[in-house]
Amino acid sequence: MIKIFNTLFLLLISNLLTLSNLKSQDNLESIIDQKKRIEFEIDFLNRNNYLSVSKDHIFLLRENESEKNLKWNIKLLDYNFKSINDTTISLDRSYFINKIDEYKGDFHLFFKRNYSNDKKYLIIKYSSQKGNIIYREMNFPLSLEVKKVLYFKNYFVFLSKANNSKNLISIYNIDNNQLNNIYEFMNYDKNVLKINKINSLNFDVIVSEENSNGLKVISRSIYDLNGNSRDKIRIENKDFSVIETRFLENKYAISILSNKRSRESVGVQYNKLDNNIAVSQKVHLFENLNSITTLTNYKKTKRSKFRIGELFYIDSLSIYDNKILFTIESLKSDDNNDGFSNYQYIPFYNTYSGTYDRKINPRFGGYLHNYFMILSFDYDGEIVRTHAKKIDQLQTFEKKIYIEYIFGNDYHLSSYVNKGKIFISKHFNKIAAEDKEYTYDIETFDNETTIKTETNPEGTYHLGNKVFITYGIQNVKKINNDRKRVFFINKIEIID
């Protein structure tokens, strides 16, 4: 009898503790406010939806079937989702949108014309203020895959890749329709990693090449809009390959390092610059950073060799509170998918043919994001603080950085949105303080229930301060049990 009583008493206490925990979790204050939501129903003829933002507006482009042509519906919204303008254009269905870029509040839509041997392109400029549209068709002399476009007042600058995998940079004069090609990178074993706009008159070209020892080095040259180069700077290391470099204020450069003939990241390099010359250098290997070795359970011995097995990409480089903050994120392709995956297809469906228009590698399972790091440096290149985190189950269709950051004096915030959930972490700047983790579902309207959130497309934009918008596609059930598929945009504010 006593044993039975004791057992019942323990069960009662256990249940009370469970109820108490649930209650305390329910009473926890949320650190986010999901302020607004807008939905656009996806019907039979809707193929795809694209989104971009400027400092004042949200730009939504919806692609719809229309017999022989495709109709592109442009919706311009303010940050409170109020409609500013609604326009529809019609294009031949051979046009495939490549990218949307914002320049001085206007949006540029860059289309490639399929079946044109990669020579014909179209740029449509949409003016946010006037609501008008300007079309500009271009014919390149070579078959090119355009990787990046920079927009200037009277010029376009293109970074392209030819069929032989060599790079070409082209400067297009809008006033006279003349194309000035920079052939330097077509003739040498150089890989142009990216081009960046510096100001209204100049852009830089970041190049990767091998030195005589077989190690990769990074160089940067500045070009004017006539194609003249100047101020070349070279970043290298005698023991490691320099895989990627980010420059800050022409005073600092921070790079990701790898071993020879490998892209797996092994550390970072800090260079101080003076008059386009690296005057100092400090190397910080991952095996010496406790924040990352702790995550991987690495124990240093004479025989053990640290290897994280990841490719890190630079996300941001900035100055906050007299410290240089450097953020990186790992990204690698999952090519071992054995069954059907959402990541096998470019995400639009041709309702007339009944098939997906474009299929990629059937074994492609998306891009895996496994780790990210925040590294804080002083101006001499010494590490002040590091935060490293293992990311759980972040898998994306697009090869792009996903983590957003907000830096603060007491702590830094990192966040990302994936598969219908919002993930936020607080990384405290005090050494002994542990990170805090928060997870929330993307909220729908009160009369709806989310059945599934798709991963393709999805994305997040930081609007400033602690306000974000996130977008994607959801399958929802209404209160009357009707189901629909919607493209949604949610506005989120971190209120902590």
Segments and roles (model prediction):
Residues N73-Y79, Y121-S128, S170-I174, V217-G227, ...:
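Beta-propeller blade signature
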Residues I31-I42, S83-I89, N132-M138, Q178-F185, ...:
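A short beta-strand motif characteristic of beta-propeller blades
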Residues Y50-E67, G105-S116, K153-A162, L201-N211, ...:
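Short beta-strand elements that form the blades of beta-propeller/WD-repeat-like
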Residues I233-I243, V283-I308, H387-E404, A433-N465:
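Conserved blade-ending motifs and adjacent loop-strand segments that build the rim/top face
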Residues E41-L51, D92-D101, N139-Y151, Y188-K197, ...:
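Repeated scaffold domains used in trafficking and secretory/extracellular systems
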Residues M1-I31:
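Bacterial Sec-dependent N-terminal signal peptides
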Residues F44-K153:
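Post-signal peptide N-terminal segment of secreted/secretory-pathway proteins
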Residues S66-L70, Y115-K120, A162-K166, N211-K216, ...:
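Short, solvent-exposed loop/turn segments at conserved positions within beta-propeller repeat blades
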